[in-house]
């Protein structure tokens, strides 16, 4: 179970309610540092740090994409898989409106709005993942099975090397 000193974010509330076994990982946040900074600060492989990306389709419907920290999303391939013309990243303001989180502190847990979640398939085979806990400078770690149990993401293969 989580330590009592966890920040109380909507993500942490959902993780506790779902009885997810997670560990806190606070780190010094750097503006525009991304997953390379969090991986470095925590001493973990960037491939195991999962970024939460808020995107929208050509009908302006939002969706969540979970991707390895060292990969980018092929939006063209994602659009093809989900059957839309295009998928694009949301603006920071739009992402915050849908999730309730600031960019850099976006978690797929406890979002303001329910959205479909697409997860890069390779995330499921990792031993442990590190994902944002709903605050800048705060990741939580868990097994991919816990994430899958709670979010029930749709597996996709859309990751590309930057």
Predicted regions: what is each one?
Residues 1-162:
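Extended, low-hydrophobicity, polar/charged segments
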